[in-house]
């Protein structure tokens, strides 16, 4: 990762050490492509003793822009897109022949993060409202995940749990985290407005709530590609009299805004699973400073549960604690889920078939590589 590697580092870059199924072809690899060759002595095989993977050579063609890569795929210059693309491309792909579209369930949950505990120098009367859990609850009630999935993802997504654990992780997903708020959206709006009528009852002529005579407006940090999300959140939050606006987060949002409490709300993607909770739960909910706990949440009971979950050697107890933690996360209304987006990727079928759909993965995955077969005559 050095921009000016010395001779020793250069040698290591071009002579990697590993035990995988393919090895780097240094003679054919360069700045525009990476070539891997299947190693004949790979230890895993199929039951009949044949190679586990059917692909002899993999060439990664490096493109700087996704639209160029998509054009190359449609023209037949490459076989597979090794990246997830926007759901906006689904209609385009559906019109093309010889394409396999993988619309796989995702593992990435988009959340709306509240700056509930900014450093003292970044506090102001409007931002102080976010310190009130009831105020955050009211905003959470106004979020309609189904509408976001329909309009932002073109239907290519699923509802996300308030406990931020995927329901497909059946061993430790806790459905109780999703029973804290009413299911019916109209009932949710009524409850949200009743809460806010107590906290900030005054409104302007447009129906937006006021604090000290000024409209309550929050800015949501996001990337240019997330402006659609903010636009539909504007519509939803207007129903409870709260104004939100998009704010570009720039190239280094952590240093510029997030680590320094210089934000109201921000969009943040999270992925939690058994393999990462020991590290990611503290980073998102416990650690202050330069961590993913952007809103600087402090909850001693939650912290204690996370700490015990990390260090217990009893797997049953770990699962039990994971189930206890999810409603605690949900009750904070700190990282409120918006949706879980599908992983959309595509491959050509005129040269190879046998592509597999795998949760959380693009079509370029281990299962596909094990099942690929060349089309007869090609």
Language-model features and meaning:
Residues 18, 22-23, 159-204, 222-227:
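Structural transition elements
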Residues 25-37, 61-122, 146, 150-152, ...:
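Extracellular/periplasmic solute-recognition and catalytic clefts
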Residues 8-13, 42-92, 234, 243-251:
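Ligand-site clamp/hinge motif
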């Amino acid at each position: 990762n050095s921009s000016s590697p010395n001779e020793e580092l250069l040698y290591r870059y071009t002579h990697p050490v590993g035990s995988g199924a393919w090895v780097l072809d240094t003679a054919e690899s360069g700045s525009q492509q990476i070539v891997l060759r299947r190693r004949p002595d790979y230890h895993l095989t199929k039951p009949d003793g044949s190679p586990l993977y059917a692909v002899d050579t993999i060439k990664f063609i490096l493109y700087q822009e996704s639209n160029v890569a998509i054009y190359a795929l449609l023209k037949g210059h490459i076989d597979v897109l090794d990246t997830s693309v926007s759901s906006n491309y689904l209609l385009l792909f559906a019109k093309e022949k010889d394409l396999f579209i993988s619309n796989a369930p995702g593992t990435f949950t988009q959340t709306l993060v509240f700056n509930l505990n900014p450093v003292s120098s970044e506090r102001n009367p409007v931002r102080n409202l976010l310190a009130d859990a009831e105020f955050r609850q009211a905003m959470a009630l106004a979020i309609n995940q189904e509408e976001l999935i329909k309009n932002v993802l073109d239907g290519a997504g699923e509802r996300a749990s308030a406990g931020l654990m995927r329901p497909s992780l059946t061993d430790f997903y806790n459905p109780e985290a999703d029973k804290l708020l009413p299911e019916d959206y109209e009932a949710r709006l009524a409850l949200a407005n009743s809460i806010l009528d107590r906290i900030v009852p005054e409104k302007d002529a447009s129906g937006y709530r006021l604090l000290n005579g000024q409209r309550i407006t929050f800015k949501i940090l996001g990337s240019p590609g997330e402006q659609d999300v903010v636009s539909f959140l504007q519509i939803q939050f207007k129903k409870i009299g709260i104004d939100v606006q998009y704010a570009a987060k720039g190239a280094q949002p952590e240093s510029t805004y997030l680590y320094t409490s210089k934000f109201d709300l921000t969009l943040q993607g999270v992925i939690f699973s058994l393999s990462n909770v020991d590290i990611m739960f503290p980073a998102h909910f416990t650690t202050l400073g330069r961590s993913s706990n952007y809103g600087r949440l402090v909850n001693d009971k939650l912290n204690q549960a996370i700490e015990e979950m990390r260090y217990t050697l009893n797997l049953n107890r770990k699962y039990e604690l994971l189930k206890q933690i999810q409603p605690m996360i949900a009750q904070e209304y700190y990282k409120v889920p918006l949706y879980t987006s599908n992983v959309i990727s595509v491959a050509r079928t005129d040269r190879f078939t046998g592509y597999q759909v795998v949760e959380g993965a693009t079509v370029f995955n281990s299962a596909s590589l094990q099942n690929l077969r060349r089309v007869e005559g090609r």
